[in-house]
Amino acid sequence: MATSSFPLLSFQEFLTGSEVEKRAVAQKLYNAFHTYGWVYLQDFGISKEEIAEMFAMSKKYFERPLEAKVRDTLNDAETNQGYTPDGAEANGGTDHKEKCFNLSVNVLQALAMVMDLDMNYFSSALAKADPQLRLLYYMPIERSIIESAGHARIIPHTDFGLCTLLFQDNVGGLEVDPFHTGEFVPATPIEGTCVINVADLLQRLSNDRLRSTLHRVTSPPLEKVGSDGMLPARYSTAFFVHPSADVEIDPILRDGEAKKYESVNAGKWRTMNTAKNYANILGPDGVKV
């Protein structure tokens, strides 16, 4: 275990190893997602320097005047692109976005190997995908506000796509409830790792064998809190992986297994859930959700 929350796994042998080594890594990844829904991944093909460049770009963006960022305001549930006051999404450079996409395909192919699916199963499902790279900024705020009832930097939620790749700074505050018991444990930042979690569509597709679990962002460790009681600014970069809009997500069943979910259209699912997250944009039928 990397911390009290979920495992740390090297992805190197899946990328460069033999078939036996690939399958061993794939099984460990599957086991982590089956048990916890989360994993710390290291040796995944994106350098520390490239990640640092992304954070520098994010910091530069959020240092712009508010009026400049407001011009980028998100207002369309289908495109789901733009600035929102508590976070933003931006194209951080084709190279980084493509590397994140390639990593997500490799992660999903590893799962396909264990699930006895065609190795191109997820590649096909992502053929016309529009993943989202989000640069997230959490402003400094009084610790007393965050720790009062009903408050958090991000309230407990699950992600609604296939999976999410998350790169954290060293501030901390991400917490995970892997067993939905109400007991959140820290996903402590580990340098050189990418945190990956299962999202709702992958849970549906696997008929609950892979787990999409609650997570939130709250106060970082006490040593990160200033003497004035202020929480420092926090930056993270999230890459949300969604299937192509025309893909139908229908649970893959094992022999004798009861189907737990009805089929859903990936595009409509995404638009509906995006609209739920933002009060000022429209759902798939042109009305506010």
Give each language-model segment a name:
Residues 1-92, 97, 101-103, 108-289:
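C-terminal flanking tails of non-heme Fe-dependent oxygenases
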